Amino acid sequence: LRELRPTEVDWKQLLVRMAMDYKSCHCGFHGFSYRLLPKENGTFACPKCGKIYYPLTNGMDRILLAEGEKLYECQTGRNPMDKDTVTGLIVENRQKKGLYGIKNVSQGVWRGFYPDGKIKDIPNGQGIPIWNGMSVRFELGEEWNLRLVQQTEERKEDEDEQTV
């Protein structure tokens, strides 16, 4: 019976995951990510102001990226219990307004994989744009991907006809 009970480490990991899943939007919305509204393209929106969250996934877990969000050591680094050390920031590109990226503020070097096949090391102070098809490999070597649903031309034409 004892082996069926969650260990202290299991409980701590669960609490850290719950803390990372809790969202506080600038508009005043507070809640877990399941309360965000799913969009057709795979993104999520704040139910109060419509702020868009982009899902970065490793196949099992996801990190929701949006302007002003932070990534923590428990998500990107070597310590799965550290929910206090910031390792990444979601920031707007200074030259291209409306384009956001993940800025590395950790001591480690990340690796970015771009949709066109380019690979780039991302040291402290550098970043990778949040583009559909991009991937990032954090310090531990785990690859996280952003894959949104592409609208087909036929579907887009149908939507255009409905709005006319």
Where are these regions (language model features)?
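Terminal C-lobe "cap" of eukaryotic-type protein kinase domains
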Residues: 2-22
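Short cysteine-rich clusters marking metal-coordination/redox-active sites
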Residues: 24-28, 43-49
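N-terminal beta-hairpin/loop module of FHA
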Residues: 53-95
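C-terminal boundary/linker segments immediately following FHA domains
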Residues: 113-164
